[in-house]
Amino acid sequence: MTEFDTIAAISTPMGEGAIAIVRLSGDEAVEIADRLFRSPTGKQLKDVPSHTIHYGHIVDPKSGRIVEEVMVSVMRAPKTFTREDVVEINCHGGFVSVNRVLQLVLANGARLAEPGEFTKRAFLNGRIDLSQAEAVIDLIRAKTDRAMNVALQQMEGRLSKLIRELRQTILETLAHVEVNIDYPEYDDVEEMTPRLLKEKAEYVRGQIEKLLSTATQGKILREGLATVIIGRPNVGKSSLLNALAHENRAIVTDIPGTTRDVIEEYVNVRGVPLRLIDTAGIRETEDIVERIGVERSRQMLKKADLILLVLNYHEPLTEEDERLFAMTEGMDVIVIVNKTDLPQNIDIERVKELAAGRPIVATSLLCERGIDELEKAIADLFFGGELEAGDLTYVSNSRHIALLEQAKKAIEDALSGIDVGMPVDLVQIDLRRAWELLGEIVGDTVHESLIDQLFAQFCLGK
Amino acid sequence: MEYHGGSYDVIVIGAGHAGCEAALASARIGAKTLVITLNLDMIAFMPCNPSIGGPAKGIVVREIDALGGEMGKNIDKTYIQIRMLNTGKGPAVRALRAQADKVLYQREMKKTLENQKNLTLLQGKVERLIVEDGVCKGVITQTGAHYYAKAVVITTGTFLRGEIIIGDIKYSSGPNNQQPSIKLSEHLEELGFELVRFKTGTPPRVNSRTIDYSKTEIQPGDEEPRAFSYETTKYITDQLPCWLTYTTEETHRIIDENLHLSPMYSGMIKGTGPRYCPSIEDKVVRFHDKPRHQIFLEPEGRETEEVYVQGLSTSLPEHIQRKLLETIPGLEKAQLMRAGYAIEYDAIVPTQLWPTLETKLVKNLYTAGQINGTSGYEEAAGQGIMAGINAAHRALGREEIILSRSDAYIGVLIDDLVTKGTNEPYRLLTSRAEYRLLLRHDNADLRLTELGYRIGLISEERYQAFLAKKEAIEREKKRLQTVIIKPTPEVQEVIRQAGGSELKDGIRAADLLRRPEMTYEHIQKLAPADEDIAPEVAEQVEIQIKYEGYIQKSLQEVERLKKMENKKIPEDIDYDAIQGLATEARQKLKQVRPLSIAQASRISGVNPADISILLVYLEQGRIARVSNE
């Protein structure tokens, strides 16, 4: 049960504002923050007075690397919003870094807050007026149902299938350990040895790691939506890039492992993290296709999550424009018809035909017109048009990652238990925890299923 | 002829494993208690396995003992073999199991009941309860006697409308051809109880003289003296072995060919059987590619040649049972003494009970044991002692006693029953306990003696010994936390011999003990204590230090559980008046009527959003209450 643990969430709207705040509430809020916070003076948050703010860094305790420069406020119960201990970590705005801080907080003992949970706690702890009771209930009901819808949508397909398979593997292993315990004399059941258990645990860990690296949503959260801008020379690719970057404070990075001549920049559009690929090429007004060749750029486009295809409003469609449409068939494309400040020469009907239902946005980047519409189109695409920025798609994604990370940690605990020679039935505690955590992702933690498995898998009886 | 038979504080119906514990607990607490049984010669009868204990179940026996119950003491006086199981695994799953001398077990238990102060034994058949305004006030027997009491405990096992089935023969009967209890079952239905039909079975028994043991493997008991009860000091050392053999392909062929004669498959048996003890025909059907199944031959006592054929539970016709025996190595010429059979019986749906085992429908009426849908002597006894305690406390105007899931396996058992119900005869398994590392065989006394003493079931003498043990454990733990072991050549030698790596520096004794290869014995050698450390103290010190990390983790989870248990839900809450609850959750809540948020959250179909809503209402104190009309 989850009513009394420490919860955390990003409590500022995403993609807006100069700072973003990760808020923790609960008994362990200060303790968890202390695991991540390094002050230049060496002070610890547990020692600071209540309602004070402190400068320092958030450091990943595993790697020892600095993740973010922060101001941390410590507010102890009961004079806080939730009437519990509250810590607020003020980060620089921008999706990627604040999200990493949140992930660290979650990996170090906090649970991601459910929608409306801070309010709920405030309420349960007597902070909120009686008249708001019904509203809170509506909130819980509505948000939970919606979160479930979102979770279900995301669960369709590969991720959920993989997780279910993984859970089944763990379950069979658990049942095996259990049958050895509850029926020690059934000699025809193979004994689950530490070695065998280790093999299973390592397999599960490998699978979780694979999931963490391949789950698209997870990748997007950590790395941003891989975005490529394409278009003929002089259609305004560079202006588009600048407009997006200018508005959203791009971070220029040279990603190791990608082609040396491809530089990436991060921008945050209404809470959607975009990783703009080949910005150098665009700034030199060269198109990616020209620069790295048709075949490689085709590969690059295939890997992209989002393609911004820029056309010139002032000129008729060319063969090259048509070729770009052909190359991006079936991909997530937003068509941008730029230079609307000039007279129209483009055949809009033909553009609509080529776009085949994918969004078309008219802009004049020069006059800074249509940028809002473009950003909205990007956000709509990402959030499926159903959810506004800062809402649940992001939350549930983050939640899944957090759960996977926790499951991985549980497996690692199990493995280190095996290494120091702990008995199988103790190691099993951590293995079972991993199984439960994975179950939370797919919304399935029915206790009885272990017992069902036990009797389905083994032949027992008097 | 109707007549007034007498007045008591507590009446217990039935004297099986649940009834005996209920009656003894009640009488020992000081309630004037009457126990009525169909047959005084069948007190504490074991209709199935002649054994007590095993994983989870053995821990229940220790818990019963720590609470001041009788099962542990009684088996310690009467076992023919005892073994510690799972010794190669962690401390959490170790468990004792004893083979009982069945007849002696009954005789000893009967003697204990007969000599118990405040306790009256009576042979008779209860057919009705005296219920006035929803309150149970006594019982009426077949002979017309009216016995009055402030609380009544029903522990009728598999007797309620029992029916024995062998092949195509089916007849009304309790276990082992005892007379069944039919009218009481009908009466419970009249009172409004929802009953379910369960089924269980038992294997044939054969004559030991006709077994060729040379074709089987011997299974001896432990040489080390062992006992269930913390009070036992005399150990039985003269033990009898059990024997292991296997079914053959021929056995399976006969089963396959005669499956149509099995009442399980012909549709004659409608009751739900337990998955954990399937009949041999079930096993052959479900695990068809398994070439053989284990058969344990268990002697039923010292004064009898009867042997229990564990693993061959069946309801196939008698002549097929004979054929089956002929195919099993060692049993080719075995004389069948009793045929195996299946038994169907009525059980009450256990979600109709409060966690005290009092029924929600009829006040002051308690039920315990197989009637509540469980199976197993230990499960029955565990419920029996709790029902006995609560019935006596009701009669004497004392508090209710409920064990939590983190206190005892008995707590897990009762909570599962009353919160989740069961759709098959319920058996305890270690995997049902989420805090099994805390619910160990070795620490049952540390968990429950305090409570047993407070209730009045543990003697002053035993309590003082318990306190002394507790102090000794703490003292020794503290010592090991402070004593430093230095890397002298002698120390390095001991460590090397244990297979560990040498010390670089001085180390606290406790830290050294945490190394997997080190035992308390090693530490005692390296840093001897000034006082004599009793083995049971050493055991605690070793376990508590060695597994501290895991124990701490479990304790933290228990902390969270306790917080939720402290959020109480009023008994008369009106769930219909709470808006926002999902329909399924509302139904389940109305049915189970959980006493705390913790219990509510364990009901299947009640999801976290419903719990949140419930919490909101509780915090607001705006609970609509059902009027008690």
From Swiss-Prot, chain A:
Residues 224-383 form the TrmE-type G domain. It is found in: Cytoplasm. InterPro entries: G_TrmE, GTP-bd, GTP-bd_TrmE_N, GTPase_MnmE, MnmE_dom2, MnmE_helical, P-loop_NTPase, Small_GTP-bd. Binds 1 potassium ion per subunit. Keywords: Cytoplasm, GTP-binding, Hydrolase, Magnesium, Metal-binding, Nucleotide-binding, Potassium, tRNA processing. GO terms for molecular function: GTP binding; GTPase activity; metal ion binding. (6S)-5-formyl-5,6,7,8-tetrahydrofolate binds at R23, E88, R127, K462. Its EC number is 3.6.-.-. Mg(2+) binds at S238, T259. It is an enzyme of class 3 (hydrolase). GTP binds at residues 234-239, 253-259, 278-281. Homodimer. Heterotetramer of two MnmE and two MnmG subunits. Exhibits a very high intrinsic GTPase hydrolysis rate. Involved in the addition of a carboxymethylaminomethyl (cmnm) group at the wobble position (U34) of certain tRNAs, forming tRNA-cmnm(5)s(2)U34. This is tRNA modification GTPase MnmE. It comes from Geobacillus thermodenitrificans (strain NG80-2). The lineage of its organism: Bacteria, Bacillati, Bacillota, Bacilli, Bacillales.
Curated annotation (Swiss-Prot), chain B:
Its cofactor is FAD. It holds the Pfam family SAM_GIDA_C. NAD(+) binds at residues 273-287. It is found in: Cytoplasm. GO terms for molecular function: flavin adenine dinucleotide binding. FAD binds at G14, A15, G16, H17, A18, G19, V126, S181, Q370. SUPFAM superfamilies: FAD/NAD(P)-binding domain. One of its GO terms (biological process) is tRNA methylation. GO terms for cellular component: cytosol. It comes from the Bacteria. Keywords: Cytoplasm, FAD, Flavoprotein, NAD, tRNA processing. Homodimer. Heterotetramer of two MnmE and two MnmG subunits. NAD-binding protein involved in the addition of a carboxymethylaminomethyl (cmnm) group at the wobble position (U34) of certain tRNAs, forming tRNA-cmnm(5)s(2)U34. Belongs to the MnmG family. This is tRNA uridine 5-carboxymethylaminomethyl modification enzyme MnmG. It comes from Geobacillus thermodenitrificans (strain NG80-2). The gene is mnmG.
